[in-house]
Amino acid sequence: MWRVPGLLCVRVARKSKFSGSWNRPAAFMSTLLINQPQYAWLKELGLREENDGVYNGSWGGRGEVITTYCPANNEPIARVRQASMADYEETVEKAREAWSIWADVPAPKRGEVVRQIGDALREKIQVLGSLVSLEMGKILVEGVGEVQEYVDVCDYAVGLSRMIGGPILPSERPGHALIEQWNPVGLVGIITAFNFPVAVYGWNNAIAMICGNACLWKGAPTTSLISVAVTKIIAKVLEDNKLPGAICSLTCGGADIGTAMAKDERVDLLSFTGSTQVGKQVALMVQERFGRSLLELGGNNAIIAFEDADLSLVVPSALFAAVGTAGQRCTTARRLFLHESIHDEVVNRLKKAYAQIRVGNPWDSNVLYGPLHTKQAVSMFLGAVEEAKKEGGTVVYGGKVMDRPGNYVEPTIVTGLDHDASIVHTETFAPILYVFKFKNEDEVFAWNNEVKQGLSSSIFTKDMGRIFRWLGPKGSDCGIVNVNIPTSGAEIGGAFGGEKHTGGGRESGSDAWKQYMRRSTCTINYSKDLPLAQGIKFQ
């Protein structure tokens, strides 16, 4: 049993059938994990010691070979050969050619193909979820849940494929019809982040496909194996339907590939998920060519608990929102505003709840908290904790790196900072929760909105008037506005995205499909006359 500094309660959890030697020192691990017997299941996904990272109907790759690592022990899993610029050019051309075939397939038939993709993902849900846990570092239930989210989006997209379209509008001219025609944009570039390497691609891919688009995916380099495994599943479905594999192309790579996608006029829409800093650069490059971008960037999300809040909801909600995925969700709660009358009680309850968090091997079924994704993330965590102290904050729980292999840090609670402290207004992708006291509604609504990001927000109250003020024009300015639930855990039926420096894009449900299509207003004259609009006479 390894020891953890501080107050964290560590428990031995049951191992899943996929469990490996997560805590063995690196000196004992002389080979890639994929070559060790306990990780033989990786080959069920078609993975090998070295994997091609380019797919455009056939597999290849002439770029740099990178190694991906397990965040739970920092040991190498397998290698991926990334795309060269020549690979990128070839893939874009093949994707454009594939689009010309896919666009002619009726939308309900496209939905049938997406349904088959969902079914194929269902068949691999446990093993693919285990890969997400292994390469990203999130706990197994979240890894499997992420694959389930892609499956759910496929189900949603199947129904949507029979519903997309525009209205017939009343024309002011006799013998005329006025309609909206929606067509696919063409090629959709999808750049995803490490934290949701399956689900975010699924949000974009399933909806873009039923709209009639081809897709070009560049995942995060640190989760390249996941990108390869998912693409292999999709490629088999396309092959079985005698469709070009380049409809769902893949170019694993780094900033050079991402920059090429942003600047490429052949990429009709670029969906980018990542940091606000990089997202701004992407937006400028796309805008320079008058292209379309769909941005899902940072979040500095807040939970507000009023004096009438049900604390039996507040405490577990704050715990899950702040600690889930080790604080690496876009919707992670980073700020907790507590009415002054309940502040001390909630903080004490939270500290007790944090002490019960089960930390360990992400594959163990009872574990709730895994590692950060990289060593760099650990450094960022430590830097943020030190900065919070310098700015007047008090670490009342956590704040340290855990004494064990891997990228484990203690989930952390900080009190005593000003609501507008510099570190509070800086998104740190780590499990740090800043807690504040407030006096009244106007004050705390303003504090919620004063940060540059506008992704997710939540209040806890029983006051119906306050709830509707929160939802109204002077309430939360976020894209996700919740009541009596956490900031994280969005459902696929709603449009996902945020305002301000979060980017303004919307993915997944509701009418987010419109971002993957272009709209034409069409006037059809079926009469023998030629009346002009607005009653103009031109004779």
UniProtKB/Swiss-Prot annotation:
Residues with PTM N6-acetyllysine: 94, 462, 500
Biological processes annotated in GO: glycine betaine biosynthetic process from choline
Residues reported to bind (S)-2-amino-6-oxohexanoate: 331, 489-490
Localization per record: Cytoplasm, Cytosol; Nucleus; Mitochondrion
Record-level Gene Ontology MF annotations: aldehyde dehydrogenase (NAD+) activity; betaine-aldehyde dehydrogenase (NAD+) activity; identical protein binding; L-aminoadipate-semialdehyde dehydrogenase activity
Residues annotated as transit peptide in the record: 1-26
Modified sites of kind N6-succinyllysine: 94, 537
Record site feature (Transition state stabilizer), residues: 195
Catalytic activity of the protein: nonanal + NAD(+) + H2O = nonanoate + NADH + 2 H(+); (S)-2-amino-6-oxohexanoate + NAD(+) + H2O = L-2-aminoadipate + NADH + 2 H(+); betaine aldehyde + NAD(+) + H2O = glycine betaine + NADH + 2 H(+); an aldehyde + NAD(+) + H2O = a carboxylate + NADH + 2 H(+)
Biochemical pathway: Amine and polyamine biosynthesis; betaine biosynthesis via choline pathway; betaine from betaine aldehyde: step 1/1
Residues that hold NAD(+) according to the record: 192-194, 218, 258-259, 274-279, 296-297, 427
Catalytic activity, EC: 1.2.1.31, 1.2.1.3, 1.2.1.8
PROSITE patterns linked: ALDEHYDE_DEHYDR_GLU
CDD domains: ALDH_F7_AASADH
Gene Ontology CC entries for this record: cytosol; mitochondrion; nucleus
Keyword set includes Endoplasmic reticulum: no
Matches recorded under Gene3D superfamilies: Aldehyde Dehydrogenase, Chain A, domain 1, Aldehyde Dehydrogenase, Chain A, domain 2
Active site: 296 (proton acceptor), 330 (nucleophile)
Record keywords: Acetylation, Cytoplasm, Mitochondrion, NAD, Nucleus, Oxidoreductase, Transit peptide
The keyword Oxidoreductase is annotated on this UniProt entry: yes
PANTHER family: ALPHA-AMINOADIPIC SEMIALDEHYDE DEHYDROGENASE (PTHR43521:SF1)
Main function: Multifunctional enzyme mediating important protective effects. Metabolizes betaine aldehyde to betaine, an important cellular osmolyte and methyl donor. Protects cells from oxidative stress by metabolizing a number of lipid peroxidation-derived aldehydes. Involved in lysine catabolism.
Family according to the record: Belongs to the aldehyde dehydrogenase family.
Subunit and partners: Homotetramer.
Protein name, UniProt field: Alpha-aminoadipic semialdehyde dehydrogenase
